[in-house]
Curated annotation (Swiss-Prot):
CDD domains: cytidine_deaminase. It comes from Salmonella typhi. Zn(2+) binds at H102, C129, C132. This is Cytidine deaminase. It comes from the Bacteria. Keywords: Hydrolase, Metal-binding, Zinc. The active site is at E104 (proton donor). GO terms for cellular component: cytosol. The keyword Isomerase does not apply. Pfam families: dCMP_cyt_deam_1 (PF00383), dCMP_cyt_deam_2 (PF08211). InterPro entries: APOBEC/CMP_deaminase_Zn-bd, CMP_dCMP_dom, Cyd/dCyd_deaminase_Zn-bd, Cyt/Deoxycyt_deaminase, Cyt_deam_dimer, Cytidine_deaminase-like, Cytidine_deaminase_bacteria. Residues 48-168, 186-294 form the CMP/dCMP-type deaminase domain.
Length: 294
């Protein structure tokens, strides 16, 4: 078990500990539960779906990287597939505050990058900030997405974001988590192809500036992130953050990164290179390259 989970795990009910122990035994537990695992945990612990999600929130929050605020937020995105995806907030010392990943963004990006097609609910241990409410409004689940908070009745995103501005106001039909493939040809080595594949998945209906990042760890594991734009622009999640989020949720540290590649168009309206390189260098990675989509 990764050390970050030990305190939260010790506070779980005994029957839930017994069921979770073999799942968490892997140091690189992927911070997600399959639909089958969720069903097993519900039956073993005698909890319904909502109660189980609340019980597991401390494990999600344990994934937080909060060197600046020391305020850990955890979230669990519940996919329409039945799979659950952990998320937690991330802060990057030496970079800028704008590079921060919020817990809800973390869980949602996690689900999206693992191929989830839509979300039924998000469970989070603190009320979503306005930034996250706007981010969630880009999803194909729309304002019907259920939000679950401890000690409160469940509500929909519509309740948390009244008179919402979103993609429909800009006549955007393809939403975040809808299947997309922009068709860029895969070239180069394995890491380069992974970055291009991530760029092909980008949600970028506002700038039409696709981008993807691939990070290679010292053990050969590769994590990718795809660009996810938002109708309100500022809640947009850059591709590097998506990749760093997956890497961290899987129990890796920034020091494990040995190479990074950004895939983007050289003549795009928005360019990720400078911000991507600056953030990676702040985290200690200097082996950074760029491949141009064409």
């Amino acid at each position: 078990m990764h050390p970050r989970f030990q305190t939260a795990f010790a506070q779980l009910a005994d029957n839930l500990q017994s069921a979770l122990a073999p799942i968490l035994a892997d140091h690189h537990f992927p911070a997600m539960l399959t639909a089958e695992q969720v069903s097993t945990l519900k039956n073993t612990a005698g909890l319904d779906e909502d109660a189980l999600a609340f019980a597991l929130l401390p494990l999600a929050a344990a994934c937080a990287r909060t060197d600046l605020s020391h305020f850990n937020v955890g979230a669990i995105a519940r996919g329409v597939s039945g799979n659950w995806y952990f998320g937690a907030n991330m802060e990057f010392l030496g970079a800028t505050m704008q590079q921060t990943v919020h817990a809800e963004q973390s869980a949602i990006s996690h689900a999206w990058l693992r191929g989830e097609k839509g979300l039924a609910a998000v469970t989070v241990n603190y009320t979503p900030c306005g930034h996250c409410r706007q981010f969630m409004n880009e999803l194909n689940s729309g304002l019907d997405l259920r939000i679950h908070l401890p000690g409160r009745a469940p509500h929909t995103l519509r309740d948390y974001l009244p008179d919402a501005f979103g993609p429909k106001d800009l006549e955007i039909k393809t939403l975040l988590m809808d299947e997309q493939d922009h068709g860029f040809t895969l070239t180069g080595n394995t890491l380069t192809q992974a970055a291009i594949t991530a760029a092909n998945k980008s949600h970028m209906p506002y700038s039409h500036s696709p981008s993807g990042v691939a990070l290679e760890c010292k053990d050969g594991r590769i994590f990718t992130g795809s660009y996810a734009e938002n109708a309100a622009f500022n809640p947009t999640l850059p591709p590097l953050q998506g990749a760093l989020n997956l890497l961290s949720l899987n129990g890796y540290d920034y020091a494990d990164i040995q190479r990074a590649i950004l895939a983007e168009k050289g003549d795009a309206a928005l360019i990720q290179w400078d911000a991507t390189a600056a953030t990676l260098k702040a985290l200690g990675c200097h082996n950074i390259d760029r491949v141009l989509l064409g």
